[in-house]
Amino acid sequence: MHDMAKKIDLDTALRIIDAAKKKAKELKVAMNIGVVDEGNNLVAFERMDGAWLGSINIAMNKAYTARAFNMETKTLAPLCQPGQPLFGIHASNDGRLIIFPGGIPLKDGDTVIGAIGVSGSSVEDDQAVAAAGAAAL
């Protein structure tokens, strides 16, 4: 019998967000953190106290991008520069694509079952916090 992949339900999404928040607190940064399921539907979102309002949509769109392409948003950045094969892609999908670090697909083995998106600090901090959340899966 074939095992079914895990699903990103609310409890799972909240566990991922809690792990991400723990890392954000270690880094002393306030983040916006969103988790989407396999259908790219928002399951949970948290804005830490003091997190930038302008980063709310960025965090959600990082999760959207990571799930839409099943790759980390940091992987898209070099491919989207002038002269590169995906230049201009960030203008597609109604402008929702984010091509800098902080979005990571969530996987059960090799199967992508959702994504996390984080925004609110430097891209290095965003990526580290997203990675901590993804590791909690």
Task: List where the protein language model places each region.
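Flexible, solvent-exposed loop/hinge segments and secondary-structure transition points
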Residues: M1-L137
